Amino acid sequence: MANDQMAAQMSGKGGFIAALDQSGGSTPGALRLYGIAESAYSGEAEMFRLMHEMRVRMITSPAFNGDKVIAAILFERTMDGLAQGKPVPTFLWEERGVVPFLKVDKGLEAEADGVSLMKPMPDLDPLLARAAKLGVYGTKMRSVINLASKTGVAAIARQQFEIGEQIARHGLMPILEPEVSIKSPDKAGAEALLLAELTKGLDALPADRQVMFKLTLPETPDFYAPLIKDKRVARVVALSGGYTRADACKRLAANHGMIASFSRALAQDLRQSMSDAEFNVALASAIDEIYRASVVKV
């Protein structure tokens, strides 16, 4: 069964997760980095069409395959789109051996108590049902911790686990992403609070339940080792969080058992104006660098 193969790949295979899940708010910045100015398109539909073209260019590139990229996180519109005539999740798994995940959050609430919780997701159940039908294996949702606030961090963890439970009821694997901002004045303090709260959340899980975590690269290497070793955790992946690719990869290589789930760091050298040959070389080089940091540790 495809799901069993996907589960085995997610918990054990060497490689990393490509985060291709820019949403409306972050799309103009991603397109700008790719070399498309905001003046080059008008309206949301055109913006998302250009973004989809970029995503399809990435996932159909020869280097983008399950040898090094074990999974990809998609934005809803990408999940609903086509690549080489097939639904994107089907294309990823059948043609590339890449496990599809879906970003499900609707963005962040305003900061309160040092954190930004996720906005309500009133349409989550129908979205999850649709994703499961399209062959998506799991989900990802992000909230942000700016300060080492005990009550704030507890609220972040609680919300992630509660919605994670709703996702699991659809037979999907939730990636919980409580991001600690790399600009936090007490990043290490926030990470200590987060580790304690995530451990608490794991202790409350039903016996057969597993989750994944997507976490900021910690100040202390191997800080999240207890989570990585926990049987209730299928995988712990790292976000690049604004670090350059070189810096993110250097930090990642010092964290044993943690693999990358990079977005900007994966696409930072890609440009629309490149020939396909140039594009493929640039993407292959980024994939190689991130793969190495995910599997070769110092």
Task: Locate predicted features.
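Aromatic-anchored, glycine/proline-accented short structural segments
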Residues: 163, 167-217
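Short amphipathic alpha-helical patches
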Residues: 154-155, 187-190, 290, 294
